[in-house]
């Protein structure tokens, strides 16, 4: 998924720099999850974290409720009016289920220009074309702990001597 500050171009290099052995992998500033999704799953304890609650909710719904999420996305329209309505609802923190909020947020990312969530991108996009990606992400996230914490609190909770920490500031 496109995300501001994403590590798509660097993911291969980052994974090659991992030590041969580590017990924990903590994605401190998770964003689009490019490194986590590129890293082969193993026996290590994995944590994905991001401070953006909408993004974390989306990944939790992908992991825990993929069928409900895909159903909520099945018949959405690709229109500027819907984009504006969704953006407004999320900005107002309108009451909605976690799945509905995840579906809205995913629509906002997919329909916005450069995934920036601020302007309608006007490119037609059939959400159903992403269902296989949602299913793949669901399988990959099955054993991943997903957190929505400030990075200092996250590190205090999870960091131990054998942790492989990936924070973009260290690269």
Go through the PLM ranges and name each one.
Residues 27:
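Class I SAM-dependent methyltransferase core
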Residues 41-148, 152-153:
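Class I S-adenosyl-L-methionine-dependent methyltransferase module
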Residues 155-158:
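Short conserved loop adjoining the S-adenosyl-L-methionine
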Residues 1-20, 24:
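S-adenosyl-L-methionine
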Residues 164-171:
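Single conserved hydrophobic/aromatic residue that forms the stacking wall/gate
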Residues 21-24, 44, 161-162:
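Short coil/turn segments at beta-strand junctions that form active-site/ligand-binding loops
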């Amino acid at each position: 998924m496109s995300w501001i500050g994403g590590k798509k171009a660097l993911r291969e290099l980052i994974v090659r720099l991992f030590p041969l052995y580590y017990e924990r992998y903590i994605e401190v500033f998770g964003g689009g999850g490019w490194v986590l999704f590129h890293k082969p799953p193993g026996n290590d304890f994995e944590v994905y974290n991001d401070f953006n609650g909408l993004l974390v909710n989306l990944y939790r719904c992908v992991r825990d409720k993929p069928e409900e999420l895909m159903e909520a996305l099945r018949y959405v329209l690709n229109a500027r009016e819907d984009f504006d309505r969704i953006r407004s609802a999320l900005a107002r923190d309108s009451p909605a289920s976690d799945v509905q909020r995840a579906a809205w947020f995913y629509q906002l990312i997919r329909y916005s220009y450069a995934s920036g969530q601020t302007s309608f991108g006007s490119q037609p996009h059939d959400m159903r074309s992403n269902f296989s990606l949602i299913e793949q992400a669901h399988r990959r996230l099955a054993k991943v702990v997903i957190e929505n914490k400030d990075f200092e609190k996250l590190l205090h909770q999870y960091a131990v001597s054998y942790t492989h920490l990936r924070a973009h500031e260290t690269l």
